From Swiss-Prot:
It comes from Thermofilum pendens (strain DSM 2475 / Hrk 5). One of its GO terms (molecular function) is ATP binding. InterPro entries: AAA+_ATPase (IPR003593), ATPase_AAA_core (IPR003959), P-loop_NTPase (IPR027417), Rep_factor-C_lsu (IPR023935), RFC_lid (IPR047854). This is Replication factor C large subunit. ATP binds at G54, P55, P56, G57, S58, G59, K60, T61. Part of the RFC clamp loader complex which loads the PCNA sliding clamp onto DNA. The lineage of its organism: Archaea, Thermoproteota, Thermoprotei, Thermofilales, Thermofilaceae. Keywords: ATP-binding, DNA replication, Nucleotide-binding. Belongs to the activator 1 small subunits family. RfcL subfamily. HAMAP family: RfcL. It comes from the Archaea. The gene is rfcL. Heteromultimer composed of small subunits (RfcS) and large subunits (RfcL). GO terms for biological process: DNA replication.
Amino acid sequence: MSAVKVQLVPWTEKYRPARIADVVGNEEAKKKYVAWINSWVKGKPSKKAALLYGPPGSGKTSIVHATAKEFSWELIELNASDVRTREALQQRLLGALNTRSVLGYSGKIILLDEVDGISTKEDAGGLQAIVELIEKSNWPIVLTANDPWDPKLRPLRDLCELIEFKKIGKRDIMKVLENICSKEGVECSREVLSAIADNAKGDLRAAINDLQSLAMGKKTISLADLQILGDRAEQETIFDIVRSVLTAKYPEQALAVTRLPSLDYEMLMQWLSENIVYQYEPSLQAIADAYDALSWADIMLTRMKREQQWALLSYALELMTAGVASARERPPFKFVKYSFPEKLRILARSKEKREKFVRAVRGAAAKIHVSTSKFRTDVLPYLRVIYEHDKKRALEILRNLGVPEDALELATQ
């Protein structure tokens, strides 16, 4: 029984750094953060709060956990997007900020995660409450955000030491994965570790989750096993390009993506073909115009290759960018989570199976109020561990999340 409990511990928690020095990468950010922490230790903080910002999995939360362990401070952690009103924040934090730390701790540190998730329209007084808490605090407060430059966060920026965390380098990610494999007794070649690190694209937490998912129930990970991973790297590099084309205010803005040195026009064609309908619905006119332009671009590319008329490439690029963006009656901008093109899937899965899984994840994610990407990286790995040891219990959890009966097995694969 104890062995099962050990296996159920997420590796992101099991191998979380215990000291600030153990936090991987971001050396400049760590220096700035340590200087700020030391100013608190000396009793003369330069700023009462620090705002750590950067992409997911870059170490923002881990460095605060490491600080608490290293200094024997009590960690009071809240997700700001979960406790968003003035009353809720004050109820959870005000008492903690003005009382002594519990027995065994020499101080406190407060972590407010994802402050950019607070909406000024919906979350009455939440941001102002954070400002007031910072001003009254007798303990260091750390805020984290992906985008600190959101106008609504300006009052917080003025009160905080701003510290930027960047994506973790591939070598650093591989070292962490190699160390985990060694401790877990998992055989994994450097080629496989390299592929996992590439796929994570700077997100160390995602890389560790992927490694744990791959290692589940086995002691050796091969390249063939990597097929179950999502195509995170490719998706993130092309999302902005697709969005630039489909949401451009003017055709010239869409055309600008053709000047990107890394543009893969054939991949762009596939992504546009897959996602035009989602971005332009419910306007049938816009959808028809966009696909018409895309079909002409496809004709140009086919003729270019068949007849070796490379001059046609410029026309094809204009059609698939400016042509698509010129669609009539386009609906107002809305955020769309673009789908990876079916044709480019590593595995030849049927479209029906893919869409069933996406709907299941989207529905389950909505039920627990997280994004689908967060559900995939932070929830599914746990469910798969549970499934390994208690299939009946895992399926019961999925049913409670609203996953349809015919998609239960898909969610655990």
